[in-house]
Amino acid sequence: MRRAIFPGTFDPFTIGHYSVVQRTLTFMDEVVIGIGINENKNTYFPIEKRVEMIRKFYKDEPRIKVESYDCLTIDFARQVDAQFIVRGIRTVKDFEYEETIADINRKLAGIETILLFTEPELTCVSSTIVRELLGYNKDISMFIPKGMEM
């Protein structure tokens, strides 16, 4: 079974994240959405809420699991028996950062990272922008997957 983790903070989960998951399902048997707990980040939604929102959204998709983790991503990948890490790339800056991390992960754990480039119409979508809009009580429905409850 080909299993990948898709790690992130997902604060909140956006249509960009959704796109990466859907595209990953075309070449993986299972995707584990790993929601990292990072004590250095101030999040809008608590970890429990993010896990709940994403699990509820994917409740009818048996090939998707949702878990939180508070260790190195490569250790989480081992815990869930994933052979791959999938990351979404929006910009050249994202690529340069992810390429470095992918090299380190390969050297430390022998795990491969698959970089998926964002569809052009989604490059402006980020959790940061969505959080800012939420802070101003703006409608965010165009930036989150249809059917996702906040």
UniProtKB/Swiss-Prot annotation:
Top-level EC class as recorded in UniProt: transferase
Catalytic activity as recorded in UniProt: (R)-4'-phosphopantetheine + ATP + H(+) = 3'-dephospho-CoA + diphosphate
Names of required cofactors: Mg(2+)
Alphabetical keyword list: ATP-binding, Coenzyme A biosynthesis, Cytoplasm, Magnesium, Nucleotide-binding, Nucleotidyltransferase, Transferase
Gene Ontology MF terms in the entry: ATP binding; pantetheine-phosphate adenylyltransferase activity
Gene Ontology terms: biological process: coenzyme A biosynthetic process
Pathway noted in the entry: Cofactor biosynthesis; coenzyme A biosynthesis; CoA from (R)-pantothenate: step 4/5
Cellular localisation: Cytoplasm
Transferase in keyword set: yes
GO cellular component entries: cytoplasm
Domain of life: Bacteria
Residues bound to substrate: 9, 41, 73, 87
Xref: PANTHER family: PHOSPHOPANTETHEINE ADENYLYLTRANSFERASE
Role, per record: Reversibly transfers an adenylyl group from ATP to 4'-phosphopantetheine, yielding dephospho-CoA (dPCoA) and pyrophosphate.
Subunit structure: Homohexamer.
The protein, known as: Phosphopantetheine adenylyltransferase
